[in-house]
Each structure stands twice: as structure tokens, then as C-alpha cells.
Amino acid sequence: MSDHKKAILAGGCFWGMQDLIRKQPGVVSTRVGYTGGQNDHPTYRNHPGHAESIEITYDPAQTDYRALLEFFFQIHDPTTKNRQGNDVGTSYRSAIFYVDDDQKRVALDTIADVDASGLWPGKVVTEVTPAGEFWEAEPEHQDYLERMPWGYTCHFPRPDWKLPKRADAKA
């Protein structure tokens, strides 16, 4: 279990992000919460500056950080600042909260590849910032779409969205 790694991503409402990412090969567990804001112990009703985020625990023997990021860029629009679908505000920004320098490098390389690919019509505005405290969201937000499959989401897989292989990719 100690070989597992963490990733923290934000890309709009955390319900849809969690519902899709938790099903990916190599993902061991997920939890939704808040990070990147000004207050301690944020809540759904009080999380100024925090992004709705997902903390992913994954097995690097089964997947890698680059694969998680490529899926992340496939399921949300990284070219809209502080917005996903009908959700508007900094809570819904696109962000990668890296836990070490290697994750930062992979994040920046992946963003460069997404921009170069032309798969999205605009330039990627995803923030890349060091991970701070991750505050777990209230229980009613955990695995929300698993419990309420008819609930709101603005995330969906785009099966034809595939980045070209990078010659020097090391994830």
C-alpha cells in the first residue's frame, strides 16, 4: 500500500470528475474536497478561493501520472477559465496541484502537448500549483453520482480525444 501515489486535480464540479476518474485502471481510491483557498476547514457553503477537487490514490504499477492527466484533459474543458459547463467561479477552475517536482514537470509537459495537439479549440488555462492542504468534502458529496446516477454532471469521456505519443515521455 505504501507504493501508492497521490494526485490532486480540479476541473469543475467534483461529482463528475470523481465518477469518471474512479473507474480508471490503476485508481485505488478517490475522495472529493477543497484545496487552493484561503480558509481552513472549508465546507460546500464556505470555501473562498478553494477549488472543488479530487484526491486520487493510484497504483503506479498499473497506471502513471501522465495517463491520469491525459484522461483529466479528456473529460473537462481546460480552455475555459473558472468555468465548466453551467458552473462558473473559481471553485470550478481547472487546476493541477502537484505533490513533487516530477508531477510538476509531467503536468507542464502534458499541457504543452495538449496545446500543441489542437484537440481543444483554445489555449489551456489550467493552473499548475503546489499542492497544499486537501480538505475532504462533506459525506454527501463523496461518490455522489454513484449514489445518485441521475445527478448533475458536466463531465464526459471523449473517446476520440487522444494525445499523440511524446517521443521523450517519461511519466
Curated annotation (Swiss-Prot):
The keyword Oxidoreductase is assigned to this record: yes
**Which keywords fit this entry according to its UniProt record?**
Oxidoreductase
Give the source species: Mycobacterium sp. (strain JLS)
Query: What does the record give as the active site?
Result: C13
InterPro entries assigned to the protein according to its UniProt record, in alphabetical order: Met_Sox_Rdtase_MsrA_dom, Met_Sox_Rdtase_MsrA_sf
Q: Would the keyword Oxidoreductase be found if you checked this record's keyword annotation?
A: yes
Q: What does this protein do?
A: Has an important function as a repair enzyme for proteins that have been inactivated by oxidation. Catalyzes the reversible oxidation-reduction of methionine sulfoxide in proteins to methionine.
Q: What is this protein called?
A: Peptide methionine sulfoxide reductase MsrA
Gene label: msrA
Quote the EC number.
1.8.4.11
